[in-house]
Amino acid sequence: MSMDISAFYQTFFDEADELLADMEQHLLELDPQAPDIEPLNAIFRAAHSIKGGAATFGFSVLQETTHLLENLLDGARREEMRLSTEIINLFLETKDIMQEQLDAYKTSQQPDAESFDYICQALRQLALEAQQQDAPAAPPVVAQPAPTAVAGGMRVSLTGLKANEIPLMLEELGNLGEVHDPQQTDNSLEVTLLTTASEEDICAVLCFVLEPEQISFTTPPTTAAKPLPSAEVVPPPVAQPQPAVVEPPKAPRAKASESTSIRVAVEKVDQLINLVGELVITQSMLAQRSGNLDPVTHGDLLNSMSQLERNARDLQESVMSIRMMPMEYVFSRYPRLVRDLAGKLNKQVELTLQGSSTELDKSLIERIIDPLTHLVRNSLDHGIEDPQTRLAAGKSEVGNLILSAEHQGGNICIEVIDDGAGLNREKILAKAAAQGLAVSDSMSDEEVGMLIFAPGFSTAEQVTDVSGRGVGMDVVKRNIQEMGGHVEIHSRAGKGTSIRILLPLTLAILDGMSVKVNEEVFILPLNAVMESLQPQAEDLHPMAGGERMLQVRGEYLPLVELYRVFDVAGAKTEATQGIVVILQSAGRRYALLVDQLIGQHQVVVKNLESNYRKVPGISAATILGDGSVALIVDVSALQMLNREKLLSAAAA
């Protein structure tokens, strides 16, 4: 009787992805000259677990690739093979091909045969060369614990099995070693397993089908007696394997920790967040309707409403935290990228990661990867110099690249910092002028720096597969703005460059300021609001094309009229009769004219594009406490829209 295990595919895919990521991280930590045994053991365990899972599900190509890699890793950790940078590079390449094979299986396709043949041949060739290496001292010391494990074995007990799972478990245990003395009932199986695999390795393979609490291990009494004679003959070797005997108890603790978490589909979390958002909106409606009640007559009801508001906010914060992920998910891919690209560019770069535990909403985590990757590649290519140039400038030949993340209020700040050559102001201005961009020598360094985000802008002398095509930096800026954030750049010639990204922690809720234009209510993101004031006539200055500037403490700011941008009839058209809100977007400030301020509060963001269509100048919508809809303004687009309206009016 066979068992359909296709239902467990996704569990294997998720765990294999994590194991491959761990494998890459540990490979990058290895020092070829003096490899640490702990990362080697971790890499070996990851490969062994993937191989076992691949065998279980019949993924033969992935199983064979991992088997060859596992044998080489075993030789390396037994010191039967000397590691080198080239060997680690081959292991990293193998990991990449294993990822491609896994991705193919995810889509029910067969992995690429050509890359499979190539990597198998490369690994077999490496194994052949390793056999020819002269390492006489290593085998007697390291190989001694293995016969003890095989001679004694371990008793493996599996409980809570279905009848059709027992043959499958026997087959899986057979893949891990020699099975002896099997004893089974209708729902349990107990065998003696002669294997060199640890309890953790066995659990990793069987837990693709079973839960950790269904698996237990005992040691037959005979195994304790067998190692004693060797202890009398050669005391040091017997003492040396003791850490291996101590390790197995750690495995159950790790599994117990893992069993306290569950995998939940993102769609289910999104549905929960939407429902909590609706609850918050309903609570706001009730609060608004109860606001006019007499507190003496309805004191109990109003107290209950206050308690409901606190509970709703606490529930919303708790549910939102479910979607938060550490920045380590993003940062973990850059050590490999920096290592490979620096080698390709013949540069020496040390990468420092800071704030990897800082959390960000999952939807933003996934969208920030591409922009951040482009900034890292740009720093390596354009920012950090080659060793000769750095030495000539009095710097260390090793460049420094820092990726950091930290919370700042309701935002997250992500920085890419290098100690390279910095931006060449004259070169950027000349290139921008040649491309027809509006520039002047009086521009600040920050304004000159922001020119690199203009469409098609590039200062590279030649086009390569790394840079020079003039695409990418404008996309970086646009993508960040679409996430409700903005980018800033600071540079010092000869000292380096810092690119700063500010993003909201989540796109599901927003701290906003409500403003009114006639009877229309708009929401301004609170992180863009600097201050508000009532303008005076002497502070307003007309400009060509119908635009006006507002002087605020010596600074001239463009005046954007919200009623004009969205064609709101009946609004106050005279600036001195309204209120001006000073906004900052993409490092630039401007004044926004509205009729009145209502107040600030937290709102639940509703996607306007999926429910209606994309509207220029509007990023989303929300439902207010009275049930009406308010539009959330895209502050980065208002200046351009205001200018377009003025030009259209002048042309008419």
UniProtKB/Swiss-Prot annotation:
One of its GO terms (cellular component) is cytoplasm. SUPFAM superfamilies: ATPase domain of HSP90 chaperone/DNA topoisomerase II/histidine kinase (SSF55874), CheW-like (SSF50341), CheY-binding domain of CheA (SSF55052), Histidine-containing phosphotransfer domain, HPT domain (SSF47226), Homodimeric domain of signal transducing histidine kinase (SSF47384). Its EC number is 2.7.13.3. Residues 509-644 form the CheW-like domain. The modification Phosphohistidine is found at H48. Residues 1-105 form the HPt domain. Signal peptide: none annotated. Residues 255-507 form the Histidine kinase domain. Keywords: ATP-binding, Chemotaxis, Cytoplasm, Kinase, Nucleotide-binding, Phosphoprotein, Transferase, Two-component regulatory system. It catalyses: ATP + protein L-histidine = ADP + protein N-phospho-L-histidine. CDD domains: CheA_reg (cd00731), HATPase_CheA-like (cd16916), HPT (cd00088). One of its GO terms (biological process) is chemotaxis. InterPro entries: Bact_Chemotaxis_CheA, CheA-like_dim, CheA-like_homodim_sf, CheW-like_dom_sf, CheW-lke_dom, CheY-binding, CheY-binding_CheA, HATPase_C_sf. Its main location: cytoplasm. It is an enzyme of class 2 (transferase). It comes from the Bacteria. It holds the Pfam family CheY-binding. It is found in: Cytoplasm. PANTHER family: CHEMOTAXIS PROTEIN CHEA, SENSOR HISTIDINE KINASE CHEA. This is Chemotaxis protein CheA. It comes from Klebsiella aerogenes (strain ATCC 13048 / DSM 30053 / CCUG 1429 / JCM 1235 / KCTC 2190 / NBRC 13534 / NCIMB 10102 / NCTC 10006 / CDC 819-56) (Enterobacter aerogenes). The lineage of its organism: Bacteria, Pseudomonadati, Pseudomonadota, Gammaproteobacteria, Enterobacterales. The gene is cheA.
